[in-house]
Amino acid sequence: LALEGSTAHVQAFAPRPMLFVLGLGDLAEALAAQGALVGIEVRATDDPAEIGALGPTDGLVVLTHDHEVATPVLARVLGATQGGYVGSLGSRHTQRERIARLVAAGVADPESRIFGPAGLAIGSRTSQETALAIVAEMLAVIRGRKGGHLRDDAGPING
């Protein structure tokens, strides 16, 4: 940037990604630790009112299996944004039930917008491994990547 013979350098910074976690416990703690490693701010809560709107680099992971708590939060978040990452923990049966409830609540196309069961398929066995799989999936989604093996991807290795 040049101003009347002076030169100034401008460096823009993207906002830090935010991951909202609905539910507390070991996995929420592991998500906070994993998020910190890669520069994601994690806010874990049991209070649905604390879940904010998602920006294009933000995410939500629903850990609770209580449909009465999860459905309104997911409906609100999916209704307010087309971007970001939305994941939900639970079995495939739980995911089908969750999708059916969201469709009944009038949410458009929830099955293509929710990543559930959340996380990349790395064979997770511990809370820490599950957190790694979820954070990696979130990063892949917000960066427009598939999250597969680099050897199978012709795109850029970094970024």
Q: What is each PLM-predicted segment?
A:
Residues 1-46, 50-57, 102, 141, ...:
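Segments forming oxygen-rich coordination pockets for charged ligands
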Residues 24, 28, 66-67, 95, ...:
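Generic structural signal for well-ordered, non-membrane alpha-helical segments
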Residues 24, 46-47, 64-66, 117-118:
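Fold-independent oxyanion-binding glycine-rich loops
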Residues 33, 37, 75, 79, ...:
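Short, well-ordered alpha-helices that flank and scaffold nucleotide-derived cofactor binding pockets
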Residues 52-97:
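Rossmann-like adenosine-cofactor binding region
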Residues 83, 89-159:
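Adenosine-phosphate binding glycine-rich loop
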